[in-house]
Amino acid sequence: LRVLQVDSGREWRGGQNQARLLCRELARERGVEQVLVTKRGSELARRAAADGTTVFEVPWGWGLDPRAWFRVNLAVSEFKPDILHAHDGHALWMAHKTLGDARLVATRRVDFHVGRFSTWRRADRIIAISTAVKNVLAADGVAATEISVVPDGIDPDEIRRSAEQPLNVRGQLGLPAGTRIAVNVAALVDHKDQLTLVRAAAHARPTDPDLHWIVAGEGELRGPLTAEITRLGLTDRVHLLGYVEAADALIRESDVFVMSSKEEGLGSVILNALALGKPVVATAAGGIPEILPADALVPVGDAVGLAGKVLDALSHPPSRMPFPERFTAATMSRGVLALYRSLL
């Protein structure tokens, strides 16, 4: 079985890590050969190569870069894959324009709607990372037979190892050692909705004035978030750290992990928090309810409810939730491999 994995590698987020983990796990399977095509010099290229994956790095700028398209075609003609697996929308456009007779698989990680003439409809099979994503695709008219649900997965031991080196975020922020902190790790983009998290911080302050909120991530929402933090008088309680490479160490130092998304394919960073034994509070967006029990969830946009759940988790910490086996990288890889084989 020959598989050409394609990811634009434009950033390093959960989707790129899933592509890396899939390549790593498939390399352990007998009879599977694979090559990863991704952006030259990207974090995905670096990390996948460090895992031992064969990586074909290509120039890949913004937009539909013809240089990348040419080199994806070159990789297809040289490698002659049975399966061409696209891991994001840009990769899918490149993949569906290539020459050859490989079966086209595409992983859909977001619960956004797809248009009538979307390239996503060109795939032989779409992997939805949650039932919520599958339901959105089905509502948009994609045939159920063309969608398979394979949840994201992580390596819990890898997460724990990556969190071993202390970050000492309290010290960096000049906070006393015992200060309670609620942590969010997500890009600062509209669908992650950290504005609701900031408003939750305002609602929580009268009850727990010493609670600090830390947001790790970067993006277009930084300006509006900074303005809202200032408007609510929270500049000494809500801290925007920007991108934090040692995100797992940050999560490990938290007292509670918080997600405030209004749209979410699955929310795989929640899995990292569970692997580190942290209580999690989140909005019931997209696939998040497929990970967390109902008593850890609040409605999307409910800042008051989010504040209340965070305060409850701090005052009455829930029992440590065992890590669910269905969300391991090994389980994810087995599901994807079974799908590949079903197409041949």
Short names for language-model regions:
Residues 132, 153:
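Carbohydrate-associated surface elements
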Residues 100-131, 140:
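A conserved, positively charged/aromatic
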Residues 243, 262:
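Aromatic "clamp/platform" in nucleotide-sugar-dependent glycosyltransferases that forms part
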Residues 13-24, 180-203, 213, 220-226, ...:
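A conserved mid-protein helix/loop that constitutes part of the nucleotide-sugar donor-binding site
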